[in-house]
Design a protein with these regions (language model features):
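A short beta-loop-alpha structural element at the N-terminal edge
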Residues: 4-20
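Conserved GNAT-fold acetyl-CoA-binding loop/helix
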Residues: 26-44
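Conserved beta-strand-loop-alpha-helix junction that forms the acyl-donor binding cleft
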Residues: 106-117, 133-135
Length: 140
């Protein structure tokens, strides 16, 4: 485990960082957003406490991403692009498992995000379902 890796609970001072992180996400990794929310919408979302746990990922005192746990034990993880690497991803997930021990975790990964799919498998996750979405604008 990396000694300089920290998972810090989010607070109000992190809102701007989280918005910047969201704005830099690759479109292929979006599962929960069709379009970028406004900053005000983003703050409302954070303040609605949508997750049971939400942490800033920090290495060497630099914020590089976030990781959260939904109320259904689903893990979400996002890094700034320059910090996406498999060893770092694995270290963050392992640290998260130590911080939030549970019997069972889920991870939603876009089927287009092959890097995260491979990493999830390396960490012992296995495919349990395919989820499909119907876009209301495409009715028959």
């Amino acid at each position: 485990m990396t000694d300089n890796l920290k998972l810090l609970p989010i607070n109000e001072k992190d809102y701007e960082f989280l918005y910047k992180l969201l704005s830099e996400r690759k479109q292929i990794t979006f599962i929960s957003h069709k379009k970028m929310p406004t900053y005000e919408e983003h703050v409302k979302f954070i303040e609605s406490e949508p997750y049971s746990k939400w942490y800033i990922i920090q290495i060497d005192a630099k914020k590089i991403g976030s990781i959260y746990l939904t109320k259904e034990n689903e893990i979400g993880i996002h890094f700034f692009t320059q910090y996406e690497e498999s060893e770092r991803f694995q270290n963050v997930i392992k640290e998260f498992f130590l911080k939030e021990p549970q019997d069972r975790f889920f991870m939603n990964v876009s089927p287009k995000n092959e890097q995260y799919i491979d990493l999830a498998k390396k960490l012992g996750f296995h495919l349990v379902q395919h989820t499909y979405e119907r876009d209301e604008s495409k009715i028959f």
